[in-house]
Amino acid sequence: MATDIARLIDHTLLKADATKEQILQLCKEAQTYQFASVCINPYWVKLAAEQLKEDKHVAVCTVIGFPLGQSTPETKAFETKNAIANGATEVDMVINIAALKDKQDQMVLNDIRAVVDAAKDKALTKVILETCLLTNEEKERACALAVQAGADYVKTSTGFSTGGATVEDIALMRRVVGADVGVKASGGIRDLAAVNAMVEAGATRIGASAGVAIVTGATGSSGY
């Protein structure tokens, strides 16, 4: 059971003050518990890839255009290619939230597609919506655009804004993307009950900094 739960979790450490020692510990924990991935800032990708090169079950996930999503599609594409060159096999990109709110759907589509194309056949792409900043209509539109762009997953949150994952948002996202696209719940998930609620609502991946606490039955602290 704990292993099944662990395989859903992106073991996450995205704080600006994370140290090399902490990243190495994150990788060690990911190997011990067999988490789906470690999710880290781009600076640490090369180190994590080196640490995990003998482990075929733990992916190296990083973030693109993070946490605001306000860099250009060209910049996001470069970040993606650079991360993959350094060993990333999954990328979580933040959409252009302003463009979505301005109803510039073609811009949002191009932005997501720039990352999807840069990652094609080399890394999974997860699209972060930052749901706490969006209306339900905007969430639906963002999900539809992510599917149209060819993304592998849609994801709720960066963990750095005003809110995290909710069961309601996961259910909405699952309804819009259908069965063939993954849904990642992230932000504020700190215990097994929260994981189970998200999975029941339709999540197929969980982003959490409290992965060890979740699989061992403790309660994790806040923070991403």
Curated annotation (Swiss-Prot):
Top-level taxon of the source organism: Bacteria
Lyase recorded as keyword: yes
Recorded catalytic activity of this chain's protein: 2-deoxy-D-ribose 5-phosphate = D-glyceraldehyde 3-phosphate + acetaldehyde
Active site: D92 (proton donor/acceptor), K155 (schiff-base intermediate with acetaldehyde), K184 (proton donor/acceptor)
EC number: 4.1.2.4
Pfam families: DeoC
GO term, biological process aspect, one: 2-deoxyribose 1-phosphate catabolic process
Listed InterPro entries: Aldolase_TIM, DeoC, DeoC/FbaB/LacD_aldolase, DeoC_typeI
Pathway info: Carbohydrate degradation; 2-deoxy-D-ribose 1-phosphate degradation; D-glyceraldehyde 3-phosphate and acetaldehyde from 2-deoxy-alpha-D-ribose 1-phosphate: step 2/2
GO-annotated cellular components: cytoplasm
Keywords carried by this UniProt record: Cytoplasm, Lyase, Schiff base
Subcellular location(s) per record: Cytoplasm
Recorded GO MF terms: deoxyribose-phosphate aldolase activity
Job description of the protein: Catalyzes a reversible aldol reaction between acetaldehyde and D-glyceraldehyde 3-phosphate to generate 2-deoxy-D-ribose 5-phosphate.
HAMAP family named in the record: DeoC_type1
Entry's family note: Belongs to the DeoC/FbaB aldolase family. DeoC type 1 subfamily.
Record protein name field: Deoxyribose-phosphate aldolase
Annotated source species: Shouchella clausii (strain KSM-K16) (Alkalihalobacillus clausii)
Lineage: Bacteria, Bacillati, Bacillota, Bacilli, Bacillales
